């Protein structure tokens, strides 16, 4: 499994996926609102969302783990 991190500080504005959902590389997992901008956190590889570590409205810091993916490459 692979941790996905936020690259910016802010708060989780919207979750775009659910645990167990298959995703393709580049798919938006969630959106972080930072300084009135919406920044997408994207899947780094094709895979399945194992766990979301944040909820809508939660604050996030740069480098904070926000999701766990099981990538197709690691199977």
Question: What do the PLM-derived regions correspond to, one by one?
Answer:
Residues 20-29, 34, 57-69:
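A structural signal for short beta-strand/turn segments enriched in small hydrophobics and glycine
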Residues 37, 71-72:
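Short, ordered loop/turn segments at secondary-structure junctions
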Residues 59, 74-75:
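Short alpha-helical boundary/capping segments at helix-coil junctions
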Residues 50-52, 59:
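A general structural signal for short secondary-structure boundary/capping elements
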């Amino acid at each position: 499994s692979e941790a996905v991190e936020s690259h910016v500080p802010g708060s989780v504005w919207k979750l775009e996926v659910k645990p167990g959902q298959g995703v393709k590389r580049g798919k938006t997992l969630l959106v972080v609102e930072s300084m009135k901008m919406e920044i997408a956190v994207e899947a780094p590889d094709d895979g399945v969302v194992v766990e979301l570590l944040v909820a809508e409205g939660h604050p996030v810091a740069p480098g904070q783990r926000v999701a766990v993916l099981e990538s197709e490459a690691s199977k």
